Amino acid sequence: MNYELSKRQFLAEIKRFVPKDRIYTDELRTLGWGTDASFYRQTPQVVIRSDGEEEVSRIVRACRKHRLPFTFRAAGTSLSGQSCTDSVLIVAGKHWERYEIIEQGESLHIKLQPGIVGARVNEILKPLGRVFPPDPASIGSAMVGGIVNNNASGMNCGVHANSDRMLVSARIVLTDGTILDTGSEASREAFRRSHPEFLSRIERLRDKVRADEELRARIIKKYRIKNVTGLNLRPLVAYDDPFDIIAHSIVGSEGTLAFLSEVTMKTLRDYPYRASAMLYFLSMREASEAVVAMKGLMAGEEDLEMSAERLVVKSAEMLDYKSLSAVDDPVFLQYRQDVDAGLIANAGPGDYRHLTAIITETKTITHE
């Protein structure tokens, strides 16, 4: 394949429907878009700042027609080079910031486009007493598209409230340009008619995985802990409906399966009180045993809305001697001869009475 010829033909085609001020091919701007938050760098040949899913659908079809690889990018806060490419980069940031609050009985869902920043979602939800469950460290700049596509979670939401568990439905653009909204019965029915074999293959794969008891058990076990390596296999054992499998497979796919143009997510209640503690231990073993003991007090994930009332320790992060020494914490320096490990523990959220009880119970466990 003659790449330069394909690129020229591709550019000629997309310039018919994408304004030239949103297409970058010059050396300076392509260089600028050639890196993310990782240490990788690849200079894209073409950068397109997209504006709407119909436009993305046409761009994707053009890429496929001219056999050009393409990569999607939101904020570019990824640490592993997911949004770097040396071919076509399709950016979904500006112009992708719409949202809609959806009441679902006593709970709230929120419909989000991929270009809205995670922290902005929490600003929107705060007056409603709700919170966006995923909380990656980069939430102040990471956008919803990247958070969901990477199944980013952060320290506090663990696996019980990550993007996969909180996703309700997704609106996606497939590599053939087809737009599918898994939350719309009309869209699902149209997809059944246009892609029957696609759905049949997903159902056959689902049945094949479930028929292998050892594989099924291994998948269930793997996704009880943080596991974002490779494509998301949990939907094959967690959902029967092929459309649910499609939607949840997008989570963690890093843009390799489809373009995520909209996602509907559950929200959780935002409680007013939280507590944190820095705990020190004589050995890594003691710290590990404390984590196990605290985990035994954590609520299950069956009903997230109710479990928040019973949650004792929400998260615990271990620090070894080297990391403690690097901080030069005054308390640690005072006891550095005896201390070998530390735990940062977060309790709550909850009301004041509930949180006081949590603190007392946690102190009892860690002293034992």
Say what each PLM segment does.
Residues 70-72, 79-80, 121, 277, ...:
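Extended, hydrophobic alpha-helical segments in both membrane/secreted and soluble proteins
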Residues 1-65, 75-108, 137, 160, ...:
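N-terminal flexible segment immediately upstream of the FAD-binding catalytic core
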Residues 77-78, 138-148, 253:
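Conserved A3 ("GATE") glycine/threonine-rich loop of ANL adenylate-forming enzymes
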Residues 27, 72-76, 83, 114, ...:
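Glycine-rich, histidine-containing beta strand-loop boundary motifs that form or position
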Residues 147-149, 156-160, 167-368:
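C-terminal substrate-binding/cap subdomain adjacent to the FAD-binding core in PCMH-type
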Residues 14, 38-70, 88, 92-136, ...:
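N-terminal glycine-rich flavin-associated loop
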Residues 10, 59, 121-124, 287-293, ...:
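Hydrophobic side chains in well-ordered alpha-helices
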